[in-house]
């Protein structure tokens, strides 16, 4: 009878203990007089491997063709939808509000190209809208207006021009302009500008900002801000403090900032505050009482005075010692 063991046990058994397969169980494993090619039949021949490779190749080819057909069908559908849609011109002139179709450029032969396809009319109009309405004198905006009016320009020409212009603008940004030039440039845009030490300052609301540093309205003024050392807890139970008028979560402060805000620096405390902290530490160590910060404030309220009187009375009544 064949002894069937789990695979791991079979693997780690000694050869002496491993039962030899006999009779029916050993059929096809070892060459015998009746069946000399038994062991070679178990491994695939070169012919089998070749057939398998051919099948895999054909399957991959079919997948690729299917993908190509799907991409072409999708492209045809999108082009039809663009041609059927009546896209209104972005009022470049008040008198001019025409609908026209830009001729699609030559389509690439295969969808597996590393570069982007030619941009659609919608994309170009969105680009034009963004560039024209941010700044009328923008060279890219002017180029796009010209392009929208002149349909004969090819897409490749237009977009190489746009890239060149953008690179030129980037290079101009990198060159440091003098503060005077910055002031003149910003004054032209109708903002209230003044000259700072290192750069221009723009007035937004009632504060002066360096260009690029404005992050929305100035929320927390010094009167409204939480105490700089203790901070407050928001609705998510996150501790926060204000930094330059903005709410900053305590955990997102750099380590040194957090360390500095743990308590006021010792040198800025008055002698009374220093003695109070020392007394609190002494009580905490020797008397085992909790360091009650609000206790001192509570003592000076009416409720606090009543509570202290009650504590004194109860201590006298029940013979308990009171450490005030």
Curated annotation (Swiss-Prot):
Family: Belongs to the mouse mammary tumor virus PR73 superantigen family.
Membrane topology: Single-pass type II membrane protein
Keyword Transmembrane appears in the UniProt entry: yes
Presence of the UniProt keyword Nucleotide-binding in the record: no
This protein's name: Protein PR73 5'-endogenous
InterPro entries named among the record's database cross-references: MMTV_SAg
Glycosylation sites: 83-84, 93, 97, 135, 150
Keywords for this protein: Glycoprotein, Membrane, Signal-anchor, Superantigen, Transmembrane, Transmembrane helix
Positions in the Cytoplasmic compartment: 1-48
Segments forming a coiled coil: none
């Amino acid at each position: 009878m064949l002894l069937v063991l789990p695979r791991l046990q079979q693997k780690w058994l000694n050869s002496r203990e491993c039962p030899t397969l006999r009779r029916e169980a050993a059929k096809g494993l070892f060459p015998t007089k009746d069946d000399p090619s038994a062991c070679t039949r178990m491994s695939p021949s070169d012919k089998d491997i070749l057939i398998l490779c051919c099948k895999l190749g054909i399957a991959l080819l079919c997948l690729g063709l299917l993908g190509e057909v799907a991409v072409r069908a999708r492209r045809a559908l999108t082009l039809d939808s663009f041609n059927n849609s009546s896209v209104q011109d972005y009022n470049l002139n008040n008198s001019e509000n025409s609908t026209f179709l830009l001729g699609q450029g030559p389509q690439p032969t295969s969808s597996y190209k590393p570069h982007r396809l030619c941009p659609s009319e919608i994309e170009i109009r969105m680009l034009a809208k963004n560039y024209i309405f941010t700044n009328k004198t923008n060279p890219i905006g002017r180029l796009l207006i010209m392009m929208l009016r002149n349909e004969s320009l090819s897409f490749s020409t237009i977009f190489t021009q746009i890239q060149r212009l953008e690179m030129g603008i980037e290079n101009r940004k990198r060159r440091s302009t003098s503060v005077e030039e910055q002031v003149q440039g910003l004054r032209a845009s109708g903002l209230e500008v003044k000259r700072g030490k290192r750069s221009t300052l723009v007035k937004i609301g009632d504060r002066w900002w360096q260009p690029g540093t404005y992050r929305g309205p100035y929320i927390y003024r010094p009167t409204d801000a939480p105490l700089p050392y203790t901070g407050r807890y928001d609705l998510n139970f996150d501790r926060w403090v204000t930094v330059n008028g903005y709410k900053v979560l305590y955990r997102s402060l750099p380590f040194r900032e957090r360390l500095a805000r743990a308590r006021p620096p010792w040198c800025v405390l008055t002698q009374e505050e220093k003695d109070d902290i020392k007394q609190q530490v002494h009580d905490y160590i020797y008397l085992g009482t909790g360091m009650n910060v609000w206790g001192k404030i509570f003592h000076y309220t009416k409720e606090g005075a009543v509570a202290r009187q009650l504590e004194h009375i109860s201590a006298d009544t029940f013979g308990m010692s009171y450490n005030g």
